Amino acid sequence: LKKNRLPTNLVFYDDFEKPKKIKNNSVDCILGMGAFYYSKNFKKTIKNQTKKLKRNGRLIFSLRNKLFDVVTLNDYAERFLNEIYEIKKLKKNWKIKYKNLFNGFTKRKKIKLKNIDDKGVYSLFHNPLTITNELLDLGLKCEGFYFYHFHPLPPVFENFDQLYYRKISWKMENPSDWRGFLLASSFVVDCQKI
């Protein structure tokens, strides 16, 4: 910053869940890439960030895509479908039959996957079909969302040929492709304070 004759206080450290160094109604735009889905209290964090924005200010941030779970063909898919089908409400023998359907593709531990979710790091997933209303309740109007980190096949295929997998993934990257609702593991939300 000094080298380019910019004020050195433009960049500073603060708590993104409870920001204290920025005054309320003082910021035009807040960019939170790869941060907000680690918040222990997402709604409170978004409210705290929104307070810092000027009227009509923008909050742009990334979220993990809950709908991606359904196409992973692993324990993420099972978790997603358990929620949709309300498995907890089924009688015991049906729960067992249902669980047996997933025996073939939920054993992630057999393949050594390097994934932050296996390291006990807390993170949230959000549904791109419902995020607009969720943010509206928090004082933000969703202007758009944009998908990224597309997966051309279930994630386990990356272990078979990582370079090829990434090559075909890059070819798919298109933030407005409808397939992103299912094939992208993350999305960016662009909101305006209302």
Q: Which residues make up each language-model segment?
A:
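Short conserved loop adjoining the S-adenosyl-L-methionine
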Residues: 18-24
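A C-terminal cap/extension of S-adenosyl-L-methionine-dependent methyltransferases
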Residues: 110-137, 142-194
